[in-house]
Amino acid sequence: MSKLIELSVSGQVLRLNCPPEQHDALRQAAHLLDNRVMEMRERTGILQMEKILSIVALNLSFELMQEQQKTQTIENVINQKIAQLEGSLENILAQKTTF
């Protein structure tokens, strides 16, 4: 069951409904976003919140894509290793059944 949560990002209060078990993670995400916005504002000197949020969103999206690519690469390597192990096991079992 969803429950109302209030979050603050760059001085703006956001009220969202989400399951209580997700409240802590959502607070952490809001804190991360708030920090990124402050860092971007300090680093670039841009004052327009819409522009800052767009840049931060683009950066976070790019980071997410990179992590997804890493995960996919790792999954591919694991699947290759599993296939190799299965092949080795099949060879061993085939050798044992011929004796």
Curated annotation (Swiss-Prot):
> What's a single GO CC term here?
cell septum
Query: Main localisation, per the record?
Result: cytoplasm
Q: Which InterPro entries match?
A: Cell_div_ZapA-like, Cell_div_ZapA-like_sf, Cell_div_ZapA_N
Query: Disulfide bond as a keyword?
Result: no
GO-annotated biological processes: division septum assembly; FtsZ-dependent cytokinesis; septin ring assembly
Q: Can you tell me which residues the record assigns to a coiled coil?
A: 76-96
The entry's localization annotation reads: Cytoplasm
Q: Which family does it belong to?
A: Belongs to the ZapA family. Type 1 subfamily.
Q: What is this protein called?
A: Cell division protein ZapA
What organism does the UniProt record list as the source?
A: Histophilus somni (strain 2336)
